[in-house]
């Protein structure tokens, strides 16, 4: 039984490790984007109040489109 179970376990671990690495990379990218957006929003909000909302919405839409393309 151990001989039959070992190869399947190894494959499962390999798939999990690869998936985790990809997920971690995506998480880091998202965190970096959010930090950049927060910094940008803070500086923009201090300078102007109303136009920032429009630019922020455009940025969010562009990021969502890019993420969807990457996922596919």
Curated annotation (Swiss-Prot):
Modified-residue entries (N-acetylserine), positions: 2
Assigned protein family: Belongs to the adenoviridae histone-like nucleoprotein family.
Keyword Lipoprotein among record annotations: no
Native source species: Fowl adenovirus A serotype 1 (strain CELO / Phelps) (FAdV-1)
A GO BP annotation: symbiont entry into host cell
Name listed for the protein in its UniProt record: Pre-histone-like nucleoprotein
Induction: Expressed in the late phase of the viral replicative cycle.
GO MF, one example: DNA binding
Record's GO cellular component terms: host cell; host cell nucleolus; viral capsid
Keywords (A to Z) from UniProt: Acetylation, DNA-binding, Host nucleus, Late protein, Viral penetration into host nucleus, Virion, Virus entry into host cell
Post-translational modification: Cleaved near the N-terminus by the viral protease during virion maturation to form the mature protein.
UniProt xrefs under InterPro entries: Adeno_VII (IPR004912)
Task performed by this protein: Strongly bound to viral DNA and responsible for wrapping and condensing the viral DNA. Probably promotes viral genome import into the nucleus and is still associated with the viral DNA when the latter enters into the host nucleus.
